[in-house]
């Protein structure tokens, strides 16, 4: 996937998530997932997004984050 994203870009990502089950005979398959957020960092191995954050760091630097392995990403679109 050759889309150049930068820190702070708002993005939409479709990706395949791992599924797991213990002591089961289920025929598991990866689960299709989607997320929107702001790029915190991107490497050849993963992309890390903030999915919920405070508008100013004056209040709090805490945020919700997700790191997705690049090999799981099926679609990445810059939305803002």
Regions found by a protein language model. Give the residues of each.
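Conserved RNA-binding domains used in RNP assembly and mRNA/RNA metabolism
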Residues: 2-80
């Amino acid at each position: 996937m050759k889309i150049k994203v930068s820190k702070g870009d708002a993005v939409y990502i479709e990706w395949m998530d791992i599924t797991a089950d213990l002591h089961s005979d289920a025929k598991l398959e990866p689960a299709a997932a989607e997320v929107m957020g702001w790029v915190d960092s991107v490497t050849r191995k993963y992309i890390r997004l903030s999915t919920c954050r405070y508008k100013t760091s004056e209040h709090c630097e805490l945020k919700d984050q997700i790191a997705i392995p690049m090999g799981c990403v099926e679609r990445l679109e810059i939305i803002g």
